Amino acid sequence: MFAEVNYINCKNANEEYRMVYYSWGVQEKSSKTLVCLHGLNRNGRDWDYIAQHFVKQGYLVIAPDIVGRGNSDYLINANGYDTFNYAADILKLIGVLSLENVCVLGTSMGGLVGMAIAYLPQNPIKKLILNDIGAELEYDGLVGIASYSNSHPEFNNFSDAKDYIISLSLDFGDLPDYIWEHIARNSFQKNLTGRYELKRDVNLSKTFTNEASENKNIELWNYWGEVTIPTLVIHGENSTLLSKATISKMQKIHPLTQVVEIKNTGHAPFLYNDEHCDIISNFLG
């Protein structure tokens, strides 16, 4: 099943823009919704394989290209690339589409967006899945992400572009070539000179890299303390961003938090196979 591609119009304090989203399944025939949110430098096509599985389980699956990524608009004012602005866009998407029985699955930044929604008093989410992200982000992991988020390389051919994205993404896990091909095909676009470039605005990382330059962990415990819905943390075994100590503290604060570790991955596991789908399905019920 191919995704349907649509968009909604969004705005923040500074400007209006278009946010593209992909959908799988028929809303009228689906009693539950899974909203999938990608990582900082990624886009909604990361969820193609997860979507195929959960449509068969009766879900409507929605995966946006968060503004500045994929086929969504880029912002003129980079200050608009902010977690709470992203959360407002997702809340608008949920409202415009009249989505019901919503669960959110978010990788890295996408998980932070899910947390930002879940801590709100009028939270519309039933369950939350955090893929290698939590209430405290380790400085070493932040530096690693910042080291490539500010770069915008160009490549003469797809093969070189694919090699580049693989070299950055080895922590995703030991992925088969067809998955690497899928990741690469959806990570690049041809620019006006005919060269391959990443499908994201290089300016989107400015706020993030400023925070990462402060030589300390980013702590979000005040927000986590307000999250009350059942939550699953998927932890990359070798993650440099999410520590086991952080996960343990999260569980003490919020006892409805479950944890599953994915072996031989770092930040962050790329979710696509039967094992991953079973982990998610078992939690969603």
Predicted features by range, described:
Residues 265-274:
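Catalytic histidine-centered segment of alpha/beta-hydrolase-like enzymes
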Residues 23-71:
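Conserved HGGG/HGGXW glycine-rich cap/lid loop of the alpha/beta-hydrolase fold
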Residues 100-139:
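Conserved hydrolase catalytic core segment
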Residues 156-210:
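Conserved alpha/beta-hydrolase catalytic His-Asp/Glu region
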Residues 191-249:
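Conserved serine/cysteine hydrolase catalytic core
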Residues 1-34, 56-59, 275, 281-285:
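Alpha/beta-hydrolase fold catalytic core
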Residues 65-70, 134, 263-266:
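Short beta-to-alpha linker loops that shape the active-site pocket of alpha/beta-hydrolase fold enzymes
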Residues 56, 63-105, 279:
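Active-site loop/oxyanion-hole signature of alpha/beta-hydrolase fold enzymes
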